Amino acid sequence: MTAEIQSAYLAPEGLNEPLLKEIEGVISVQDRLILSSQPFINTYWAQNIWKNPKIIHIDSINDAAKKLESNQRNWCLYSFILHRRAKLIEEKLNSRKPKLLTFPTSLSGDPLGSWCLLDENTILASADCTSPFPNGKPSFIEDKSGPPNRAYLKLYEALTLAEKLSLIHI
């Protein structure tokens, strides 16, 4: 299975089915992560797409961190199995910690890769992902006492992504 993976798609919470209808060559579904034997395509329902993921065989937690950091600096974990081992690897990485965003904001130019454990000694990692946010989910500072409220958070996300796509200038 691992040699065939050419792309991976992270579905939003509860939306695996619409995403599965868009993707061909599905190898397996791991929680919200859908693995495909086909090169990546842009989809409507993916929260994040892992372009050209690589299989990395590891011997230890330290070995995993070294191999990930040799590919790039910033990584985001998507954990669906072996949560404790994955967290230990994540702690060894020198990745920048995601911070809450204020609106309006410009997105960082630093690329953010995504990775997961497929089993105890195998990592699936992609240094090239479609979303600049950890697991495709932005975290804006929320004003809990007055406007703006939670409804504005989706608007903030949409406008921030529109700026990334050069559709608007904030």
Where are these regions (language model features)?
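SAM-dependent transferase fold signal centered on methyltransferase-like domains
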Residues: 1-168
